[in-house]
């Protein structure tokens, strides 16, 4: 197989599930702008890079994706059929510039009525979270044009009061603060690009559930170029990989939680 020439390269911490699924989100959006886009993970010594080949001739496709997201006001709206879901924190939404529906949190792994990956509640609704995070992302982009570079896209932070909790680098432990910042609307330094793009990536690319370990999941950084249609197979390891990673969903209370740091899954 001939590896295509990438025109997007993102530094990614493979131990960070939020960054991993944000990469999946980038591939999802690139594929909608430039059908046939392919992506893969690679390692350069201790660093991992997510490559995307869009084959579109654009001089900066990553900036084009970020512009599409940040220029939309609002970025998300409630889906047309949202009234069928009575709970505000479960209502499906649409990413307006891409007409992409997000409702993965309604799809459980087992017999429940919501996904085990849903880690928000109450006022932290998908619509409110994504629009609030996008406001923060716009502020970051305003400060300098180089804030859209792949070397730092997932690491730039801004204080926000609405987030999902996909990025463990921004997560608060209840034992440290004594209360839930999400419930109290306390601003938390958050990487908006990671949170938004992970929410998008999880619509199609979901981690595998680890049996007999409650709220533990696994993902695989795939090493071969894949289009978005087959990326879900890459996530669960049906392709050449750079290894397998397992991570917990850490619940601070019965409603709020976050993705924990991943580690190499030795039993894979």
Which residue stretches match the model-derived regions?
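Early compact domain cores of eukaryotic multidomain regulators
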Residues: 1-140, 144
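Elongated scaffolding segments in large macromolecular assemblies
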Residues: 2, 6, 10-20, 24, ...
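Intrinsic disorder/low-complexity segments enriched in polar/charged and small flexible residues
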Residues: 36, 42, 106-107, 122, ...
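Extended amphipathic alpha-helical scaffold segments
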Residues: 120-125, 132-151, 170-210
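Extended amphipathic alpha-helical repeat scaffolds
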Residues: 153-159
